[in-house]
């Protein structure tokens, strides 16, 4: 009987892996596996970074060790040489990002709601969204000078397009089934727009918002290199020109940490705004 059973299992089309009971994962590890793997990956990166410099593969004139970078970062925050440069950059990035967020969502929703506007905006969109920001720096300087206005304008430009594109795509992609159901129940245009279109579109708009937040600091560093007396971009460039390698990488570290904090904040906001979707999709 056992032989017959074994033969039937071998002749079955069911893969052997599906016949074996899956291994039960540790509940704690299942919950924190991303954190665990993230810490391991970061540790391996730091070890590799230290080894590259310590073994002489790369001169410390070009790449400081992790410990020297962290020391320069802490010292810069303690004596104010680095801390005083972070806040002006954060202010510019936040102002530019908020302006781009308002314009991008408002115009994106408008264009996405009217099909004729989509057709009119498509060639303009294809042209401007692919222009290099560095190529446009002289244009911004020409119009706004080298003061705060040009830096904020550059950030607005870099942040606007991801938000606008995602907003247009999200609004125009709202399922007709939802719209027809709302109309069948007697909902008016304003109600459909505020209670159906916008909630359905927001989950698809948020990836553009997060990309825009990343673009804000990338564009800001380029803008600060054009001119100005303070800012994280100025700090990094000045340290580079003076061959202060640990200070240069400390500035880069500060920029990365600010980006992580901003991304974490946006993740929490997205989690709250799209909570209704998780209830429907069990995510």
PLM-predicted stretches and their roles:
Residues 1-41, 264-283:
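Transmembrane alpha-helical segments of polytopic membrane transport and secretion proteins
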Residues 18-31, 54-99:
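Periplasmic/extracellular loop-to-transmembrane helix junction in inner-membrane transport proteins
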Residues 54, 109, 116-123, 166, ...:
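Membrane-spanning helices that line or support transport/gating and their immediate boundary helices
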Residues 95-125:
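Transmembrane-helix boundary motif in ABC transporter permease subunits
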Residues 115, 207, 249-283:
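C-terminal transmembrane helix and the adjacent membrane-cytosol boundary/short C-terminal tail
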Residues 126-162, 169-173:
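Generic hydrophobic transmembrane alpha-helix motif, especially the helices
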Residues 153, 157, 189-223, 250, ...:
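Transmembrane alpha-helices
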Residues 166, 170-211, 236:
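Short cytoplasmic-facing helical segments at TM-TM junctions of multi-pass membrane proteins
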């Amino acid at each position: 009987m056992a032989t017959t059973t074994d033969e039937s299992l071998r002749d079955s089309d069911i893969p052997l892996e599906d016949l074996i009971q899956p291994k039960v994962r540790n509940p704690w590890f299942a919950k924190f596996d991303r954190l665990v793997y993230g810490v391991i990956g970061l540790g391996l990166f730091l070890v590799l970074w230290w080894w590259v410099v310590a073994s002489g593969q790369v001169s410390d004139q070009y790449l400081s060790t992790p410990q020297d970078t962290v020391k320069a970062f802490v010292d810069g925050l303690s004596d104010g040489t680095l801390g005083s440069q972070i806040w002006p950059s954060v202010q510019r990035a936040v102002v530019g990002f908020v302006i781009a967020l308002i314009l991008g969502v408002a115009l994106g929703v408008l264009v996405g709601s009217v099909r004729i506007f989509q057709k009119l905006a498509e060639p303009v969109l294809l042209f401007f969204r692919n222009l290099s920001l560095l190529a446009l720096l002289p244009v911004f300087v020409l119009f706004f000078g080298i003061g705060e206005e040009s830096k904020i304008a550059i950030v607005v430009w870099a942040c606007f397009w991801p938000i606008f594109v995602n907003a247009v795509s999200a609004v125009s992609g709202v399922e007709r089934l939802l719209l027809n159901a709302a109309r069948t129940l007697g909902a008016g245009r304003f109600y459909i727009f505020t209670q159906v279109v916008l909630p359905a579109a927001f989950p698809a708009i948020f990836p553009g918002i997060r990309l825009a937040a990343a673009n804000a600091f990338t564009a800001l560093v380029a803008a600060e290199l054009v001119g100005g007396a303070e800012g994280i971009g100025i700090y990094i460039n000045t340290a580079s020109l003076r061959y202060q390698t640990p200070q240069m990488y400390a500035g880069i570290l500060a920029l990365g940490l600010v980006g992580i904090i901003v991304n974490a904040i946006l993740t929490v906001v997205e989690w709250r705004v799209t909570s209704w979707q998780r209830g429907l999709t069990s995510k």
